[in-house]
Design a protein with these regions (language model features):
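Long C-terminal subdomains/extensions of small-metabolite kinases
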Residues: 1-167
């Protein structure tokens, strides 16, 4: 949800082919003035909380939308957990500057970002929010339930052996 979630499917394919990753950056810059904080309530098995956020992602990847890269030891592909990332809405221009600088260098410890490892989550909003599902339009929803089905897919190397542990 949130800032830049529509960039992946709004960027014309011809522009993507021509400019690659830069096409997404240019489309994102074009939309920067439309960014609005979103009120979200997040429920996980461990806790429930709410707040105003610019972005919420649920992934199991070392890269989120090509704008942020996690350290390899922060993400495991077979631990049964998603990485739930919440970027809080900055209160002022100083916080916005700090957030922008931290995102540029992939600082996971920025005070405006929460990274949770969750097996499932319910995310609700008073208004329907646009979802991106693997880079495609996922529709608009007020309530979304996500659950990690641990071990549902077995990954096999070219030598035919299953990978027991992937980081």
């Amino acid at each position: 949800f949130g800032a830049f979630t529509d960039v992946a499917y709004d960027t014309p394919q011809q522009v993507k082919n021509m400019f690659g990753h830069l096409a997404y950056v240019l489309e994102g810059v074009k939309n920067i003035s439309a960014i609005q904080p979103l009120w979200l309530k997040i429920q996980t098995p461990e806790r429930t909380f709410a707040g105003r956020y610019l972005l919420c992602t649920v992934s199991n990847s070392t890269s989120v939308g090509g704008i942020f890269r996690f350290k390899r030891d922060l993400v495991s592909f077979n631990d049964g957990l998603f990485e739930l990332v919440l970027i809080k809405a900055p209160k002022d221009l100083i916080e916005l500057g700090i957030l922008a600088a931290d995102l540029l260098v992939s600082n996971e410890k920025t005070p405006l970002m929460q990274i949770l490892h969750v097996s499932e989550a319910i995310i609700t909003s008073p208004t329907p929010l646009g979802w991106t599902l693997d880079g495609e339009n996922g529709g608009k929803h007020r309530r979304v339930y996500v659950r990690n089905h641990a071990g549902a897919v077995k990954i096999v190397k070219s030598n035919g052996k299953a990978l027991d542990s992937i980081r």
